[in-house]
Amino acid sequence: MNRPEIQIVAISNVFTRLMHFVNRGDYEAGHTHTYDHATMISAGSVLYEVLDGPDGNAVKAKEFKAPGYVFVEKDKYHRITALEDNTVCVCIHALRTIDETIISPDSFIDPMYSTNNGEIKNAVRQLTGISWNEITRYEQVGGHHG
């Protein structure tokens, strides 16, 4: 079991993170956010689990099939596991400052950045003066559920 292949695109202040789960059983490790967002299931199917915290024990689980969306609640640890080969999911949310203010599209010099290797993190830091971790508050925890 592996982690998904990732592609990131930010247009104005809309951030998308495409996850391509090549094989059934590939997973996105448990993590949490300080904001609500949506994950679009565009191909295949996933097991979405809400975890009890950093140790990664599932307290709720539900299967989702494409096409569809998963509402990802803020401050809830969660994990996504592919149930089919070539499953594709896209996390969608607004870029925010540390105080949860959505970053204005007017603050960007160029309206679009696309990356596979972290260029978006540097671009956001340069344009806003805020670190990527402060904006996304993406905290990864735990491992896979064995």
Regions found by a protein language model. Give the residues of each.
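A short glycine-rich, His/Asp/Glu-containing loop-to-beta-strand
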Residues: M1-G30, Y35
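Short, conserved beta-strand element in jelly-roll/cupin
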Residues: T32-Y48
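Residue "hotspots" at secondary-structure boundaries inside conserved domains
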Residues: H20, G30, T39, K62-E63, ...
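Short acidic-glycine-tyrosine-enriched beta hairpin
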Residues: G53-K74
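Short, surface-exposed charged micro-motifs
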Residues: Q7, A38, L47, Y69, ...
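Short beta-strand His + acidic residue motifs that chelate non-heme Fe in jelly-roll/DSBH
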Residues: E28-G30, Y48-E49, V72, Y77-E84, ...
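Double-stranded beta-helix
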Residues: S12-H20, R79-G146
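Residue-level signal for short segments within beta-strands and strand-turn junctions
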Residues: S42, V50-D52, H93
